[in-house]
Amino acid sequence: MAAPKLESFRRGSMFDGSFRRGSMFDGSFRQSMRDRLILQSRGYSNVNDDDKTSVRCCSYSYFSDKITGVVKKLKDVLVTAWEMGTADPRKMIFSAKMGLALTLTSILIFFKIPGLELSGHYLWAILTVVVIFEFSIGATFSKGCNRGLGTLSAGGLALGMSWISEMTGNWADVFNAASIFVVAFFATYAKLYPTMKPYEYGFRVFLLTYCYVIVSGYKTGEFMETAVSRFLLIALGASVGLIVNTCIYPIWAGEDLHNLVAKNFVNVATSLEGCVNGYLECVAYDTIPSRILVYEAVAEDPVYSGYRSAVQSTSQEDTLMSFASWEPPHGPYKSFRYPWALYVKVGGALRHCAIMVMALHGCILSEIQAAEDRRREFRNELQRVGIEGAKVLRYIGESLKKMEKLNPIEDILYEIHQAAEELQSKIDKKSYLLVNAKNWEIGNRPRVRDLTDEQKISNLDSDLSRILAHKSQSEATLRPPKNWDDVTTAANLSSATMLPYLQSRTMIHKQPSWPSRISITPGSMLQPPLGEPGKMYESASNLSLATFASLLIEFVARLENLVNAYDELSVKANFKEAVSE
């Protein structure tokens, strides 16, 4: 259907051009009507579309559609706002607290303080409430202290500079301009120092206050009144904001950090179980979501979103830790100088394990996959490691949530270490399944001929152990001599006498060669030998299984560091003793 439409469009364009030529050069009304009828017969009746569009723009249906669209969008916004508020009621409470703080500040400004006129600078109190009123108590204290210190230091420096500028006489303008440049240069350079990053807002307030006092005081000649009134109004706004935010349903950054780290334990455990179960069940993506390839959030994939939340929480943990350090003792965090930094350390150790889970998920997303029968050989061992690993993560996460120490009697890593050792032992025993065993052969071996397919299959299991023993023994005897000259001389002297013995020894220890891999299908018993590309793909697919098992063992090894980090946190934070069940 596409080709006729394209052809008709081209013919229509041709007649459209003839219509224009006829209108411009021929001037014949009959010719123009004839071209118009031809266009309409071919389905092109859009000669007066502009007129119809202009009429439709002024029609009732047009305005009705526009109003309906606006109402629909407004409804969607209201539904989204309601869902956000019900998902986290703290956001609605915080908004109400902000409105209350601004209202109280405005009311207090309306009362005139005897002997001091503040009406000309009342805006600074309102700006202070808007700026320092943050979601958490720690962030509010941080910005409030930064703003107060910046204002106080800048006001004192501005008063000193104004006193010096008065003594310069006619050079006061030049001195004030030069002082602004020098102060701005050093303050901006100082805030770029890495350790000064938490005080960046204080430096900004410092510059703003200094310039404001210098410029406004120069115009009015009242440097002292400008500095004092600004400081008092900022202190008023900061006090109202801190009191309202702290006394009415306080939101603590330390508690958010505690819950975030505990939640990440559960998310990583869910991802670990999903990766192991998905790999053993041969789960494959028909098409890998593009957002996974660029590491964006995908809520529909719990395996991906679980470990991603732990890996991506680095900046959030650092921010919450810096705010929590400003908060006074509260709730279960009653000690001064609470070890919030150790929460970040535990989160980093958990993130170190989550990276292994990400690599396990990458094995599922890989183009080359191991055969199902190969995975079935290691199913029990892989599944046990996944279950025990998820159990350890959930146990630590639950202990962190309850603020309990780990049980000193029970070793929580014992079971998973046993599972990892069983997996390693199974890999050692079945290592011929993970590589191309045919390349292991040393020397030529007689091939078993004149055997039927049924005989090869029946003898396969009995040959496995003998072949593996031969390979391991031959590898164990490969030790390079220290002096090759002695070996060559001895070989030349005894070659004639030892030849019968060597021949008999060779015949005794020769084993049947490792049979080529078989694939049993309903239609045939033995598949023909694979070509070179097929063998390469087969080896790569087997190595993918070895990669998955190795990553799982590495995950187990990294759990030790996680347990040590949690033990350190539980001791310094004075967690309660574990309840023995």
Curated annotation (Swiss-Prot):
TM ranges: 98-118, 122-142, 148-164, 167-187, 201-218, 231-251
Intracellular or extracellular location(s): Membrane
InterPro entries (alphabetical): ALMT
Source organism superkingdom: Eukaryota
Keyword Ion transport: yes
Biological process according to GO: cellular response to phosphate starvation; malate transmembrane transport; monoatomic ion transmembrane transport
Pfam family, one: ALMT
This protein's GO CC annotations: membrane; root hair
Record-linked PANTHER family: ALUMINUM-ACTIVATED MALATE TRANSPORTER 10
Keyword tags: Ion channel, Ion transport, Membrane, Transmembrane, Transmembrane helix, Transport
Organism annotation: Arabidopsis thaliana
Protein name: Putative aluminum-activated malate transporter 3
Lineage: Eukaryota, Viridiplantae, Streptophyta, Embryophyta, Tracheophyta
Membrane topology qualifier: Multi-pass membrane protein
Transmembrane listed as a keyword: yes
Function, as annotated: Malate transporter.
Similarity comment text for this entry: Belongs to the aromatic acid exporter (TC 2.A.85) family.
